[in-house]
């Protein structure tokens, strides 16, 4: 299992320690949510998604030389939101995380997720 698979499996299964284990200490993290982001906020937001979602499914994955691009379906009790994530890997750790959420669906199906 490569580091991006481990990261993905860890956050989907709500394994905080697994996510932290593969994030580089100086990882660059960026997203389109309102809240400022650092590694701890990323872990907490992934926890909130994993805890609230009925299921999280990887619907697309493209691997490149230094990372992976993923698209997730985040199924909530009343509908589905989508998230794209771009992961860069350096020295066996996730060095960059870029997340793009469908904010209209997130507000509708995961209320309060990004206005913490």
Summary of predicted features, one role per range:
Residues 1-116:
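C-terminal and inter-domain tail/linker signature
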């Amino acid at each position: 299992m490569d580091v991006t698979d481990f990261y993905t499996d860890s956050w989907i299964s709500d394994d905080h320690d697994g996510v932290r284990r593969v994030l580089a200490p100086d990882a660059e993290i960026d997203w389109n949510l309102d809240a400022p982001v650092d590694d701890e906020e990323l872990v907490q937001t992934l926890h909130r998604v994993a805890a609230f979602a009925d299921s999280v499914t990887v619907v697309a994955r493209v691997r490149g030389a230094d990372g992976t691009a993923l698209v997730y379906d985040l199924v909530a009790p009343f509908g589905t939101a989508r998230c794209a994530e771009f992961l860069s890997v350096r020295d066996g750790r996730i060095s960059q995380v870029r997340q793009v959420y469908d904010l209209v669906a997130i507000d509708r199906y995961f209320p309060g997720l990004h206005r913490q």
